[in-house]
Amino acid sequence: MNDYTRTIRLSDTDAAGVVYFASLLSICHEAYEASLEASGIDLKSFFRDSEVVIPIVHAEIDFFRPLYSGDRIIITLTTLQLKDTEFEITYQVGLVAPQSSLIAKAKTRHVAINPQTRQRTPLSESLMQWLKSTENSE
């Protein structure tokens, strides 16, 4: 699953009434989790694995127009494996039809590490399969 739909909630907005930038990054992370789950990865064990953790080491987001409470959005994610220990996810955020223009674009970079040594470690086979199923075909 590369598409995730969601309604913007009041709690996602800031004092100006628009989506707070960190909230949209959090929503993008929801799309990442939903995609992992749809591919058959058990989220409970994925996030509690004691041998490998996958922290985000870089995040960026660009907004092209504001989002408001009640807006229905669709997030399309694609992945790119950068190294045997690292991958990147690109999120394209748009309004659900009839207005399907690009609202925002985000990117997160993730690195697999051993939680005890904090050293890089290869991505798991299940994560490699997920990356292949969601990779950017451009």
Curated annotation (Swiss-Prot):
One of its GO terms (biological process) is phylloquinone biosynthetic process. InterPro entries: 4-hydroxybenzoyl-CoA_TE, DHNA_CoA_hydrolase, HotDog_dom_sf. The active site is at 14. One of its GO terms (molecular function) is fatty acyl-CoA hydrolase activity. Keywords: Hydrolase. Pathway: Cofactor biosynthesis; phylloquinone biosynthesis; Quinol/quinone metabolism; 1,4-dihydroxy-2-naphthoate biosynthesis; 1,4-dihydroxy-2-naphthoate from chorismate: step 7/7. It is an enzyme of class 3 (hydrolase). Its EC number is 3.1.2.28. It catalyses: 1,4-dihydroxy-2-naphthoyl-CoA + H2O = 1,4-dihydroxy-2-naphthoate + CoA + H(+). The keyword Endoplasmic reticulum does not apply. Catalyzes the hydrolysis of 1,4-dihydroxy-2-naphthoyl-CoA (DHNA-CoA) to 1,4-dihydroxy-2-naphthoate (DHNA), a reaction involved in phylloquinone (vitamin K1) biosynthesis. Belongs to the 4-hydroxybenzoyl-CoA thioesterase family. DHNA-CoA hydrolase subfamily. This is 1,4-dihydroxy-2-naphthoyl-CoA hydrolase.
